[in-house]
């Protein structure tokens, strides 16, 4: 049995085990308002699937959260390059990045509500949560660049495009990819949390809040499952697209590295 197949069996067995624990806990409690069974949660999700509002909420939240991620990724790359070029930029940004990392998400959300509308809140919060993660990742990648290759490139006066492809991108992209894997999960959690507090109409966070105040525990679990699934699917898709882009720019050998 190969390692991949063995790993899949282990994951399946672990999933079955925890579903069994969930089912046993639901039976022991015996109150749907506190804990529904896995079958009830899935049944509620199946009921939501045909509803147009369900898909509209997904589109509303996904669009804004991914916009925040995209803006954070772009800004982090630009700021990381600027910090590498100028020490004063690094000195200015270091306390800001540390502050963003250390401040609770809820504090940012409440403060941001003073300045932005509820519908834009998830964009801003996703952006803020992604920025320090990818900034650190890009800085790490830049720092790992081969200095001997950089010296050779300078001696032979290679154009910027060739330097990027030969030295900088092979160093930065692996760290950036790893950072994106972490940042995508963070931006979904923080983005939905912003919606739960800001309550923009037609969002996933609004649906979660409504399920909570109406004691619709089945819907609460169903929407939670949707958030987890969306986060996993978008992470897989984005990383697959990023890998293809890396392969196209660097070639198969560079992509594997």
Outline where the language-model segments fall.
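Periplasmic/extracellular loop-to-transmembrane helix junction in inner-membrane transport proteins
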Residues: 2, 28-70
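N-terminal signal-anchor transmembrane alpha helix
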Residues: 5-29
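Transmembrane-helix boundary motif in ABC transporter permease subunits
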Residues: 67-97, 110
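C-terminal transmembrane helix and the adjacent membrane-cytosol boundary/short C-terminal tail
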Residues: 87, 178, 222-257
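Generic hydrophobic transmembrane alpha-helix motif, especially the helices
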Residues: 98-133, 140
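Transmembrane alpha-helices
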Residues: 124, 128, 161-193, 222
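Short cytoplasmic-facing helical segments at TM-TM junctions of multi-pass membrane proteins
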Residues: 137-176, 208
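Non-cytoplasmic
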Residues: 179-229
């Amino acid at each position: 049995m190969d390692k991949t197949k063995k790993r899949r069996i282990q994951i399946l067995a672990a999933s079955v085990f925890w579903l069994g624990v969930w089912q046993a806990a639901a039976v022991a409690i015996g109150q749907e308002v506190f804990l529904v069974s896995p079958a009830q949660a899935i049944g509620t999700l199946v009921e939501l699937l045909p509803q147009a509002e369900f898909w509209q909420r997904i589109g509303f939240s996904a669009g804004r959260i991914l916009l925040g991620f995209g803006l954070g990724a772009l800004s982090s790359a630009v700021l990381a390059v600027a910090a590498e070029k100028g020490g004063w930029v690094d000195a200015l940004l270091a306390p800001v990045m540390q502050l963003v990392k250390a401040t609770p998400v809820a504090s940012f959300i409440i403060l941001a509500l003073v300045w932005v509308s509820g519908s834009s809140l998830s964009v801003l919060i996703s952006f803020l949560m992604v920025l320090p993660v990818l900034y650190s990742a890009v800085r790490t990648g830049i720092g790992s660049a081969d200095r001997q290759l950089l010296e050779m490139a300078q001696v032979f006066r290679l154009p910027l495009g060739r330097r990027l492809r030969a030295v900088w991108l092979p160093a930065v992209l692996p760290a950036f990819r790893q950072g994106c894997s972490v940042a995508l999960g963070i931006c979904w959690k923080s983005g939905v949390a912003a919606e739960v507090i800001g309550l923009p109409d037609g969002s996933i966070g609004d649906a979660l809040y409504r399920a909570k105040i109406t004691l619709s525990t089945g819907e609460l679990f169903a929407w939670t499952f949707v958030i987890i699934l969306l986060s996993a699917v978008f992470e897989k898709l984005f990383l697959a697209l990023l890998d293809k882009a890396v392969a196209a720019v660097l070639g198969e050998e560079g992509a594997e590295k």
